[in-house]
UniProtKB/Swiss-Prot annotation:
It is a multi-pass membrane protein. The PsaA/B heterodimer binds the P700 chlorophyll special pair and subsequent electron acceptors. PSI consists of a core antenna complex that captures photons, and an electron transfer chain that converts photonic excitation into a charge separation. The eukaryotic PSI reaction center is composed of at least 11 subunits. Gene3D superfamilies: Photosystem I PsaA/PsaB (1.20.1130.10). It is an enzyme of class 1 (oxidoreductase). This is Photosystem I P700 chlorophyll a apoprotein A2. InterPro entries: PSI_PsaA/B, PSI_PsaA/B_CS, PSI_PsaA/B_sf, PSI_PsaB. It catalyses: reduced [plastocyanin] + hnu + oxidized [2Fe-2S]-[ferredoxin] = oxidized [plastocyanin] + reduced [2Fe-2S]-[ferredoxin]. One of its GO terms (biological process) is photosynthesis. Its EC number is 1.97.1.12. The keyword Endoplasmic reticulum does not apply. It comes from Oltmannsiellopsis viridis (Marine flagellate).
Length: 734
């Protein structure tokens, strides 16, 4: 008899109910729980899967390149990046009538196309690509690389090529390779590409495989490097009237510190970016060589951590025992990695609009809005994952004996103080922020808007002034020509930076007022509440006052009856589940704020945000309702336009979102009754009764139904806002 799914769990494979299928899918990636899994095999499986992950990323990027080269308008877009819409790919749909064909035929194309809102055109243009042929070449190269990585993944699963457990746990060697190799050398290589290919291309000089070894990126070659005259590489930068992609106004500098933006492209100076990557390379290559590997010199991570003991004795054992705790727990390591990547992802969202690195990206408003929203939502999901794996660490990997008295144990010991403080902050922020908003709404409703409580964000304005924003009149640090900070950099990067920060045609340090003050605190409420739920879930994962033996029940468990006081909604998984709703809520406020604020700036009408953002009806009426009208009329009884697809996606997203509630509100008994009824009717229906199944149908567990609900809620939520965002922005700016 054929073995049933799942092969990795004989217990589940023999389950006579449909639970076998759903639990099999749910635990497919929980390698630790699989039959016969050893620690060494676990590490090897995860290591090999990384190659598959890289192959997928390369194939995906390859597909982007290929479709733009085949069906896009890259070469036309380069000639006029501000007025030609970049095409992502063609669309072929048998349902299109003539109006749809005409509506979606854009960007100089001969048939229906999708417009790219991801900024890839600007990225490829900035790094030196100029022709479709180069896009094809890159696409083929990445496809081949994907094949190489798939082979490498397979190879590392073969017994001869499987790394040993000691190899995976050699922390110092890993730091050496990751810091020096992954970050350092790749940054150096990228600096090389920018200096040898991208900067010449920005000055109208083509460098390809045929001439890159003979074309000097700087007139003096390597002479200044070897003679110590490094300043030569910063001399003669591009002038303020440089036209990107041509030699008009171009200089010869390759590594500069100009500050600010290129006046034409409104992006960072490429020579500044090259300088930045070179500095990163030097720092990381040195950093990666600090640790003791083969030669008996350098730091030992274990010694460093064990030495970190607060001297007075009042703070316990410090970092003692942490080396083994971290090094032996994949969940701890994954939690740290996810927390770092989540933070970085959110930072990318902030920086890609405030300091745009790619030429002309700042003027592609739809791409700006899409990139910001995309990175903030991804950051939110990743950060929630960090706490989920932190909780799993406490349940599966934490050893109280090994961590006696250290910082980890002490955090668990005073978790009540941490949780209650977060709770207090959340309550304070919630009541005060909502109180201010509601007061202002009442004043608007009663016709006395002058009685609103409007608070200027003076501390934030002071911080902006310290960076050089002169508008507020604070005479401080970079806003004061008498300060040492001002004079120290006056001859280097400061003129460019001050021009940028005091200019009204970019997004650097936007002017802020009472509306910003309120929404800032609303976002702070969301962040603190999300953090409260996640931190409580992780710190209570092993046990709480109500359920001291929680760790024996694992990460996710359903209700355990009234006998123990009721254990519904207290597993670490439940905390993750609840936190995702708050995370989505928070990112919603963040993206609303970003988008509405920028719509005003891009349209030259900042007063609308300033006046309407101080009360809730302003947000609902002047942001959401006002900007959804074009979207909702993408198709109606009179016809359709190019927003029709987003109107449809908007509707679809609402349906997905609503489906989520069906799973979230009903409990297990409902599903069991529903399934029994369906089975009964199925078995009594002609023809349908011929189809039998071996597994006895049982309802979703509470946890499963909640997961299904959560996924539908999340997907619907993000897709609803995504379609609103792209439609409302592109309808205004093309």
């Amino acid at each position: 008899m054929a073995t049933k799914f799942p092969k990795f769990s004989q217990g589940l494979a023999q389950d006579p109910t449909t639970r076998r299928i759903w639990f099999g899918i749910a635990t497919a990636h929980d390698f630790e729980s699989h039959d016969g899994m050893t620690e060494e095999n676990l590490y090897q499986k995860i290591f090999a899967s990384h190659f598959g992950q890289l192959a997928i990323i390369f194939l995906w990027t390859s597909g982007n390149l290929f479709h733009v080269a085949w069906q896009g308008n890259f070469e036309q877009w380069i000639k006029d990046p501000l007025h030609i819409r970049p095409i992502a790919h063609a669309i072929w749909d048998p349902h299109f009538g003539q109006p749809a064909v005409e509506a979606f035929t854009r960007g100089g194309a001969s048939g229906p196309v999708n417009i790219a809102t991801s900024g890839v055109y600007q990225w490829w243009y900035t790094i030196g690509m100029r022709t479709n042929q180069e896009l094809y070449t890159a696409s083929v190269f990445l496809s081949l690389m994907a094949g190489v990585f798939l082979f490498a993944g397979w190879l590392h699963l073969q017994p001869k090529f499987q790394p040993s457990l000691s190899w995976f746990k050699n922390a110092e060697s890993r730091l050496n390779h990751h810091l020096s190799g992954l970050f350092g050398v790749s940054s150096l290589a990228w600096t090389g590409h920018l200096v040898h290919v991208a900067i010449p291309a920005a000055r109208g000089q083509r460098v390809g495989w045929d001439n890159f070894l003979t074309t000097l990126p700087h007139p003096e070659g390597l002479t200044p490097f070897f003679t110590g005259n490094w300043a030569a590489y910063a001399a003669n930068p591009d002038s303020a009237n440089h036209i990107f992609g041509t030699s008009a106004g171009a200089g010869t500098a390759i590594l500069t510190f100009l500050g600010g933006f290129h006046p034409q492209t409104q992006s960072l100076w490429l020579t500044d970016i090259a300088h930045h990557h070179l500095a990163i390379a030097v720092v990381f290559i040195i950093a990666g060589h600090q640790y003791r590997t083969n030669f008996g010199i350098g730091h030992s991570m274990r010694e460093i951590l064990d030495a970190h003991t607060p001297p007075a004795g009042g703070l316990g054992a410090g970092h003692k025992g942490l080396f083994d705790t971290v090094n032996n727990s994949l969940h701890f390591q994954l939690g740290l990695a996810l927390a770092s990547v989540g933070t970085i992802c959110s930072m990318v969202a902030q920086h890609i609009y405030s300091l745009p690195p790619y030429a002309f990206l700042a003027q592609d408003y739809t791409a700006q809005a899409a990139l910001y929203t995309h990175h903030q939502y991804i950051a939110g999901f990743i950060m929630c994952g960090a706490f989920a794996h932190g909780a799993i660490f406490f349940i599966r990997d934490y050893d109280p004996e090994q961590n006696k008295g250290n910082v980890l144990a002490r955090i668990l010991d005073h978790k009540e103080a941490i949780i209650s403080h977060l709770s207090w902050v959340s309550l304070f922020l919630g009541f005060h922020t909502l109180g201010l908003y509601v007061h202002n709404d009442v004043m608007q409703a009663f016709g006395t808007p002058e009685k609103q409580i409007l608070i200027e964000p003076v501390f934030a304005q002071w911080i902006q002034a310290a960076q050089g924003k002169a508008l507020y009149g604070f005479d401080f640090l970079l806003s004061s020509s008498a300060s040492p900070a001002y004079s120290a950099s006056q001859s280097v990067w400061l003129p460019g930076w001050l021009d940028a920060i005091n200019s009204n045609n970019n997004s650097l340090f936007l002017t802020i007022g009472p509306g910003d003050f309120l929404v800032h605190h609303a976002i702070a409420l969301g962040l603190h509440t999300t953090t409260l739920i996640l931190v409580k879930g992780a710190l209570d994962a092993r046990g709480s006052k109500l359920m001291p033996d929680k760790k024996d029940f694992g990460y996710s468990f359903p209700c355990d009856g009234p006998g123990r006081g009721g254990t519904c909604d207290i597993s670490a998984w439940d905390a993750f589940y609840l936190a995702v709703f708050w995370m989505l809520n928070t990112i919603g406020w963040v993206t609303f704020y970003f988008h509405w604020k920028h719509l005003g700036i891009w349209q030259g009408n900042v007063s609308q945000f300033n006046e309407s953002s101080t009360y809730l009806m302003g947000w609902l009426r002047d942001y959401l309702w006002l900007n959804s009208s074009q979207l909702i009329n993408g198709y109606n009884p009179n016809g359709m336009n190019s927003l029709g697809v987003w109107s449809w996606a908007f509707l679809l997203a609402h349906l997905i979102y609503a489906t989520g509630f069906m799973f979230l509100i009903s409990w297990r008994g409902y599903w069991q009754e529903l399934i029994e009824t369906l089975v009964w009717s199925h078995e009594r229906t002609p023809l349908a009764s011929l189809v039998r199944w071996r597994d006895k149908p049982v309802a979703l567990s509470i946890v499963q139904a909640r997961l299904v609900g959560l996924v539908h809620f999340s997907v619907g939520y993000v897709l609803t806002y995504g379609s609103f965002l792209i439609a409302s922005t592109s309808s205004k700016f093309g």
